[in-house]
Amino acid sequence: MLYYSMPALAAGFILDLMIGDPRWLYHPVCLIGNLIAFLEKILRKIFPKTDKGELAAGTVEVIFVCLLSGGIPFLILHILYGISVWAGFALETFWCYQLLATKSLKTESMKVYDRLKNGTLDEARYAVSMIVGRDTQSLTEEGVTKAAVETVAENASDGVIAPMLYMAIGGVWLMFLYKGINTMDSMLGYKNDKYLYFGRCAAKLDDVANYIPARLSGWLMVAASAFVKMDVKNAAKIYRRDRRNHASPNSAQTEAAMAGALEVQLAGNAYYFGKLYEKPTIGDGIRPVEVEDIRRSNRLLYATAIL
């Protein structure tokens, strides 16, 4: 089965670049998200509402989601490859195509670009709110642009490089397992009263799962900046200096490479759920952020993915 994973990865990646995610096609990550929400609701009723109880409930959730998100695709593919190699290859290619987010990331970020160029600031704020977790209602044009660029940078690892790496290692079932871990972190990994203990296991596991992919993505992005005629020396400098400027051990890896390549400053303070979070900046800000940086960030994303 693993013998066919690399050709399926190549075919799935090409399909992702060409087609992206059609809105009418149900996405498997939505199914994983529904599973996470369902299990959370059940487990919160079963376990006591104490710190230890929530930690235990969150750990049980992680175990179940990992078993189901990786195990079910593995079993389906194992059975299908046993029936027909071509059927197994076709499904593995299709799932790979669905789980990669290269074109959809470009499409969504370019909606922000379009609203900044041809619409109103409120429309741009709404467009960027669809792809970021921070509060966007009071963002300036520069703030909206930075948010879009940061999302492209961070998701270059989470949505493209990391899934490809895991599929190359173990096949598409391992890509599914990674997406299960990553989706749990995005839904449960908040450091607030509700998820501080319940989401701790999910957040820690996501840190582990992304440790190598994030660093690989950072260096790939530094190298890719040379192919799209960006500042490769500054990308390497800022990456080495600022790649730890984030509460997460992984999130700043590609943001630092992106900031250096574009010669801009990213990150900094942001509001989440009405509360100000003070965060260090990334990059020197050789020049101010401008709307065209969204387009440039996508060029760098594609170059990184192809490398």
Annotate each predicted stretch with a short phrase.
Residues 1-177, 181, 189-307:
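Hydrophobic alpha-helical transmembrane segments
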